[in-house]
């Protein structure tokens, strides 16, 4: 039996907003004749998700989804984070407390469907956790000290101890560095629906604000995060015009 056939029942939500500083109107950027958010939704539909929903505060994005027959929910303009937007979707859809919701970023048109299945499976397998996510081994030493690369340290059960932009774990003795595996966090998450509602009631945590990493709010409040360690990173998402051109060329060749 294919491992993916064992994936649990889950829903994919894709938060999408037009406000992007580095790439204006990013979700609607054209990639081979389709808006990027539609490309992301089509990749998500190749996963084992029972449904895929775009969550947006933009009527333009909603119109693009309608044109391409992608389910879309118009949400509040006042959400401070994508997680808050997903929580509203869970509420609008009246999801049961134990439902699994996978958050796929709207700028990941090359995300592997198997990775979506895996993050859902990881949460299903860790019943004591309320969130799951993914990390990959860092192979470029320069990334360890790069604050734009978020690192994560795990316990022996594969749960997150801490996420940071700092080099963690810090290697005090260079001779032991070869035995130390640094992990890069990837921004894909699965949540239990009841936790999403609890999350919106939590105050921002001081480590979260210092690092600008919203997942630290969960750890700060005693919630547990399961982390799947994948062998290698998936294709990078789209943050800049250069990224957009790279993705266009890749999809044109496929």
From Swiss-Prot:
Catalytic reactions of this protein: 3-deoxy-alpha-D-manno-oct-2-ulosonate + CTP = CMP-3-deoxy-beta-D-manno-octulosonate + diphosphate
Enzyme class: transferase
A GO CC annotation given for this chain: cytosol
The protein's name: 3-deoxy-manno-octulosonate cytidylyltransferase
EC number assigned by the record: 2.7.7.38
Superkingdom to which the source organism belongs: Bacteria
Transmembrane segments: none
UniProt GO MF annotations: 3-deoxy-manno-octulosonate cytidylyltransferase activity
Keyword Membrane: no
Function per UniProt: Activates KDO (a required 8-carbon sugar) for incorporation into bacterial lipopolysaccharide in Gram-negative bacteria.
Family annotation (Pfam families): CTP_transf_3 (PF02348)
Family from the record: Belongs to the KdsB family.
Subcellular location: Cytoplasm
Pathway: Nucleotide-sugar biosynthesis; CMP-3-deoxy-D-manno-octulosonate biosynthesis; CMP-3-deoxy-D-manno-octulosonate from 3-deoxy-D-manno-octulosonate and CTP: step 1/1; Bacterial outer membrane biogenesis; lipopolysaccharide biosynthesis
Keywords, sorted A to Z: Cytoplasm, Lipopolysaccharide biosynthesis, Nucleotidyltransferase, Transferase
